[in-house]
Amino acid sequence: SIKDNYEKVLDCKPDMIVTCAYGQFIPKEIIDYPKYGCINIHGSLLPKYRGGAPIHWAMMNGDKETGITIMKTTLKMDAGDIIKQKSTFIKEDENLETLYERLSYLGRDLLLETIPTILNQTATYTKQDENKVTFALNVTKEEMKIDFNKKVIEVYNQIRGLSPNPGAYAFLEGKRVKMYQALISEKTFKGT
C-alpha cells in the first residue's frame, strides 16, 4: 500500500500527483509534497456520492445525471475543494460498465483541461457544501441481492447499476443466479 511505500513515491520527486479510483487514504506527506498538488478524479458530481462506488449508486438510485469532479486531495475521503466538474446524463439503457467507460473518457478530457489551469495558477478552488454531502460506500453482498418486493424500476436500476460486475443476484431453486440485464415489460405477469 502507499502508506507503507510512500518514500518510493517521494523519491520520484513528482510535481503533481493525480489519482483516480484509488480507494485508499493518501498520507499527508504525499499530499503535501508535489509543487502543484495532489488531485483526484472522482466519478460523481461532488459533494454527492463521496466514496468508492459513486457510479453504482447513481444508477441504483435511478439518477438521471452524474458526472466527473476533479478536486484537491485531502486527508478526508473525497472532501477536497472542487477544481472542475462536468456533468452527463445517464441513459436509460445503460449499465455500470457502459457508464463507467463514458465517464472515464469524460474524466480524461476534464483532466486535460484542468492541469494547465493548475500549472498556470488560474484554477479556481470551490469548497464543497457539507450540507449536501451524500455517501456512496462500496456495495455490500446484501445490497447486491435482489428483493422482488421492491418496485420494478428499483430492481431494474439495481441490475443495471451492478452489471456486469459485481452483479445483482437472486436465488432460483436454491441456486444463486446473477442478473446482467433487465427489461421492463408493460405486461403484468403472475408469479411468486
What do these predicted regions represent?
Residues 157-192:
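C-terminal accessory region of SF2 helicases/translocases
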Residues 1-166, 175:
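One-carbon transfer enzymes
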